[in-house]
Amino acid sequence: VKISAGTAYVKGFDVDIDGTVIIDVDKPRDKREVSSALVPYQMGTILKVNNVFGVPAPNINDDTVFVELYNQRTSSNNSGTGELVGQARCYSFAVSGSAYTGDSTEWDLHLFDVQTFTRLVLNSAVSNTELPDASRVRGLSSGAIGYATASGSASTIVKLTEVTGVFMQGEQVIINEDPEISRSIKTVRTFGIQDIKSVYQACHPAITNYATDFVADTVLQSKVPTGFSITDKINIGVSGIATCAGKSFAGIKTDTIIRYQLPNESTERFNRVTEVLSDGSISLGTVASIAGVCNGALPSTLQITTFSFGVPNINLNDNTGLFAKIGNSNVSDIDLSTANLVVGKNILSESSDGNGVLTFDLAASGISSAFYESFDEERYSVHYGDGSIENLTSDQFVLSNNGQTVTINGLTASQSNIVVSTTLKKQALKSKQKDYIRSEKLEVTKTAVGVNTSLTGMTKATGYGLRVEDREISLNKCDIVKVLGVFESIDANSPTLDKLTFPSGLALNTNAILGEKITGSTSEAIAQVSSLLSATQVEIVYLTSEKFVQGEVVNFNESNISTTLQEITESGSLNITNIFDLDKGQRDQFYDYSRLIRKSNFAPPKRKLLIVYDRYDAGTSTGDFFTVSSYDEERYGKDIPNIGKNNVRASDTIDFRPRVSGYSGDESPFAFQNRTFSSSVNSSFIVTPNESSIIGYNYYLPRIDKVVLDDDG
């Protein structure tokens, strides 16, 4: 506890405290045990789909192909239908609560990192050079920001992802903050969740052992459109022109689905809005008819009936993170000794024999210390190589060998390239470990400005987030804990750090520890070792405003070296750490790239930067997920990250979020397409949503301490 200087009136006396006083208080160590607690898992954003063809490939450790979001219902099994209006990553896929019986069966497609697009039509075309893939586009009036989904290709149409804010028609935009490349917006259309009518993933041949692509329609809920009532009726002519008495459809988006029920028909009609006419009427077109879902044809005679819109069953505002919150805060330790985890795995490249029998064992899953679950419609599905799906029932399923072997009978005979979606119960759970890496460095040598590069020594680049002038500067790795310093060069050379020289015989290059603290006995300065340069010299980053004094005794806090400081070599680089904040990239559904964000009202740097930081690394970990046990106890006080918009303390969760791989490209790492989750540290299995685990844990109890000033001061 730090007590500041001041005067207090105690027992009739004025008591002066001349300087700051530090009082050591034992940390609270009182704990409460929770011997058994249920932890439920939701896992990702649920999009309900039907009319399914094929099976999607999860993206938690494979970014070969994404899930593409389209604005029309499917009409092809090997491409998307309509306009591409967004992208997402697949987490899991399973039947939604009932057995598969055909195209009308609903499935739960669990997604993460869902992004919908904004489409701009510019006043003049942009080339690939002017608008490279992943370019950052900013509206000069609105301040809206987005990243290009593709390069310009001499087109006036630009689609943006990761959009924040709202672009305005007529405003100017600037590309990659280059004032020489600007355009104005002729028209703008913002796509949202309500525009998603189908999904597509180009699995074949991009992903090994997936014989077909994945295609599905979104399940559409009925919604009365704004400005209309449930009793309003639509008048549909044989030509497809539709009106509503006393009402106008102006403002309705094309590709909206109109739902209506005709007399003596058991299946609803679905028609697509192809055009909104100037008189407020709409032109309707057909969609594919799906048994048990919709009749997509236009009526053959004039029809007057009530109607609604069809909107997908998804809500991004209720995004569920890929982690599970434990019941209490300030968890101190966790007991997984009796816990298990229900996980999913696609078994690939299976075949049925001549009798329609398929058998596989635990080795096919690649998961150890597990057994297959008993049959349930949500737990198992069989997807043939031609994209069709087996109507799988419990009498076809045989579990044997203590849950190690599954046999499925009654399949189509002599089929290959079968994908079986399975569910297992994993035991012997283990927390992944995070290694605390100290004093790592990143040099930023790129600039957005093409002039004076001979004076700055930098290279002009277009990738936003990789240049010194950018408001957000990517650290190109995830899970950064703290930034120790940001240093700007004063010339064309790289920035340097202060160096301390000590007497010979200490073998600092082998005996000192990278990242340990050094304390000056006279100056009270504290610094962190950033490099072990030689047997007598180290490089440092100051952690205090006080500086070391030549000749004083300094102490290396971990290696217990105590010696006299012979020489201080100041770098001359500018310390500009205070103009930045750190965004650690702790998103609800994944570990994103950590980044520096320049504070408002500060001018951008003009020369090369050197950034020194500490981070967590999980590259050698072999566990199943992250928990409080993933962190060293000494990190518990200030170095535990907070997850997502609700700032959930990571040590109070079971954390399944995938981690982005290190970035080394030239485009912006902040664009959807440049986030990659192919790191081997990410799990090869998925946590089955809507399941739970039983764990034990302890958590710290709060306490209140009182500091009393007596008359002795």
Where are the regions that the model predicts?
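Subunit-assembly interface segments of extracellular/virion macromolecular structures
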Residues: 1-713
